[in-house]
Amino acid sequence: MAETPFVHLHVHSEYSLLDGAIRMEQLVKKATSLGMPALALTDHGNLFGTVEFYQEAEKAGIKPIIGCEIYVAPGSMHEKKTTNGGRDAAFHMTLLASDDEGYRNLVKLSTKAHLEGFYYKPRVDRELLAQHSSGLIALSGCLKGEVNMALSEGQQAKAIQTAATYRDLFGKENFFIELSDHGIEQQRRNRAGLIEIASDLDLGLVATNDVHFLERAHHEAHDVMICIGTGSMIHDEKRMRYVPELYFKSGEEMASMFADRPDAIANTLAIAERCHAKLEFGKSKYPDYLPPEGKTREGYLRELSEEGLRKRFGERAMTDPELRERLEYELSVLYKQGFTSYFLIVWDFINYAKSKGIPVGPGRGSAAGSLVAYTLGITDLDPLRYNLLFERFLNPDRISPPDIDVDFCQDRRGEVIEYVREKYGKMAVSQIITFGTMGAKSVIRDVGRVLGWSYGDADRIARMIPNELNITLNGIDKKGKHEAGAIDKNPELKNAVENEPATAQLWGYASILEGLSRNSGVHAAGVVIADRDLSEYIPLTLANDGSIVSQYSMSPLTDLGLLKMDFLGLKTLTVINDAVRLIHRQTPDFNISSIPMDDTASFDLLNRGESIGVFQLESGGMTATAKRFQIEHFTDIIALIALYRPGPMQFIDDYVDRKKGRKKIEYAHPLLEKICSETYGIIVYQEQVQQAASALAGYTLGQADLLRRAMGKKDVEKMAKEREVFVEGCARVNQIPAKQANAIFDFLEKFAQYGFNKSHSAAYGLISYQTAYLKANHPVEFMAGLLGNEINNTDKIATFVTECGRMGITILPPDINRSALTFLPEELPGGRAIRFGLAAIKNV
């Protein structure tokens, strides 16, 4: 039997934080299964989930209708007060974007509500609605809507006047009286009044269900979630409650409820038919870097790159054809893909930071594979010397935005962000929102509290959940994919759930709520930059500290073509900078960027396990592994950082045995020797997979990057096709038999799943080496720098003071006449010491 045609126009997802309990994929799947041609998303006061909703709906072949249940202030949105006991602090109204202008207006309204009208809730007012009403369809709202509120108070005339005001504001054809029936007495009392108003004012009626959860059976779990959000207990009598009817009903159920008003059902389809707002993906919204007068961006980038090439390589810049070819190739890709401005923008703010003495990291992620980045000073590692690939950073065969993340001194990172704000406009730059979710252990404790469990009882169950990254209760992730969950991995937990009724109840609720978004936050490093006021593109909100934050998270911003950057704060850069400043007191020309990369004392320090304070190498496990490695070259540090991770750790024993000659090094094909010799025949890096595919099967390095990605994702169907291409390529280019080619493909596939980005490992390995060098060659200054950056951490100070003792460095006590705020080197007749800093003394 065909479903009755109907479209839900008032729906809340998990982004109505701790109020809606529906995951986006499941929401769209439900609408599709019921044969609905379209679906709206109208979260409370925000557009957080818009892009995810739109993409899921498009993927499923269902029309997405972008909307929001807004809050309308009773007077001016700038007036921060309530009347009538606070009940009318803000009225609810459902807005839907009928076209692109409507979407832009919805974005503006949401932004201004958060940035200017926030008072308990993000609010707009009638004046603002009038300015941004074009392209919007408005529904009068739920029981908390202004028309409904007037009717609930017995003020029919006021209700009519309110409806007439909004009719005039939006236009008669764009304002509908919203009808719902959740079995609530007040709704039934208001129903006749709403129908009368619609008749008197010649307005359409529309049926909605104010959906908050997917199935009727989810009502109790949703009730528990409401208690989590309000800090209530399930047995509290005077708490917020939702009725069981707010689930995603079928068209048939809705038509049955509104059998007397088929027009209200038909209007859902009519409204859906009118809505065709589109989101624009992919088109760049990057700001254009303004070069000096008379110069083009492309010309200026080339000029800076040529100048940097000469500074970095001296005479070699003129005589080495490999350098010239690589530079020309990278510039041509940047020009072709339209990322000239991007590189200039990054160069500009890094150049600013360095000019102000703000320490900048040597590189991060795949950007270290770019020669242009090296010539511009964006990175500080020669990609040719360490065989780093540009295609791992920017693939000429796959146009996708580059991703240059930058580490700055933790204390002064904010100065760089402020510079970017001033340069491109305060409203063109914002931080990026994140969403905290209800994790496996936390949701057990939250639900336990709501159900009245003691902390100890709930904690008993939570502790049974294995301490594994991304563990889920039942092995079902947010996208509905199945794998082994906590209940499969711990028999004790399974027994408790199966044999303890109270635990089974808790587990049932927690399983429904697990993974839902519970709060918003601010990304620790992410910044988005646009070519104009961001609210022309995306909705904005405010962080607790008053800074502007995007309402869309990282991935949607990238999909929409906005420039996303990570400005990370790295304490180690501050330590290095402080140590170098102290070294300059005795050695003014010391330059950390010019230290030799083959310093035996640095390697010996690591091989003895004296790595306390050495970046990335100071954990017990890493220290022990470094001793086993017996580091002889900087490349050993790069490999160590790449291997010491979950997954590739399984290859460490094999790596060490081959390195020490205890195991024969073998290669699946002679061409792999050049690629894998530095890692003793083991594929450690993602770049090695690319190089192998290129050398053996004739892939371009860009095509090989796509192969590497496919291998890493374990896409069975795609891998079968790639295997054919690889085997054919091996035969064509190197006459490798199919059997051997298949074996090589299996070999590459095995390691591709664990391979690490060599560019990142090399860049962070450089910081590791620099800290080891400072500790080995300038121990007093380095330890003073470490201590000075842990002023408020007594445990760390104790660790470093003990380490100083082991190193033979005396720690002098605080002295009001000799101590500074921080830890400083001090000369003694018998050597050098460190004077304790006054700021590290408790209560000083």
Predicted features along the sequence, with ranges:
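Alpha-helical scaffold/interaction cores of sigma-54-like transcription cofactors
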Residues: 1-844
